Amino acid sequence: ENHEFVEWEGGENRKVDISKMRDGEVVVLDNGTLRVAEKTWKAAGVAVPVFSLRSEHSYGVGDFGDLARFADWMALAGMKILQILPVNDTTMQHNWQDSYPYNIISVFALHPQYLDLEQVGELKDKALMTSFSRRRAELNSLDYTDYEAVERVKDEYMRIKYEEVKDKLDKDDNFRTFIADNKTWLLPYTAFCLLREANRTARFADWGENAVYDYRKAEELWNCEDARYISFIQYHLHTQLKRAAEHAAEKGIAIMGDMPIGVSRDSAEAWANPAIF
């Protein structure tokens, strides 16, 4: 448009043999596509599991709060991409064998270990908070992640917090919206978790009459207090991961998450939707 030189075409010079052409002949030649370098976007980044981002704010394992804090460091370093391993729930046996992040029990549910308890809020009982602060220091002092201890501490904390706020949840618009928007997967997931605990195994083939998913039974379980607690956990996880992703975006950081190829054979999806597995 401005009659300015833009770019030379790449590759060898294009050649046409006209030595045998006669007067009046015209050669129509198609040499394929224009050979110019792609204008691809490139950026530096870091690949790191969330569980490795442990900080003084953690309870023995990296959490979604640490994920947001790590984005701050990346922005200072001029990096743009933060790749993490899957953060889906993998709970089957409640021990270290559940730690493999690709053996997920739900496509949608997030792992309770990634809860940032600071964001959940302090407990009303100051003596309990002092006790949890001591246990946090003990977990953070380890040079490894004590998987079982982390799970116990976070579950204890969240159950106490749930008891504090459960009577107010029906008036919490954000919680109600989360439940309404996600009940399609929360219903089978909460039922799966409850039956896993009742049968002491995630292998649903061993659940007797519950080995085959029954929507009506899942609806019955949905109304119990333990199912609501599980949804409460997922609500906080969803909120915290969303907040971390938005914070990273504000810093110019894109979070790229690994996704498992499939789900565990003993998963909520495989149980509730056997026809597609």
Question: Residue locations for each model-derived region?
Answer:
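Conserved active-site neighborhood of enzyme catalytic/cofactor-binding cores
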Residues: 277
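Basic K/R-rich, polyanion-interacting modules in nucleoproteins and related proteins
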Residues: 27-39
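Acidic/aromatic-lined carbohydrate-recognition and catalytic surfaces
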Residues: 38-274
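Alpha-glucan (starch/glycogen) binding determinants
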Residues: 1-30, 73, 96-99
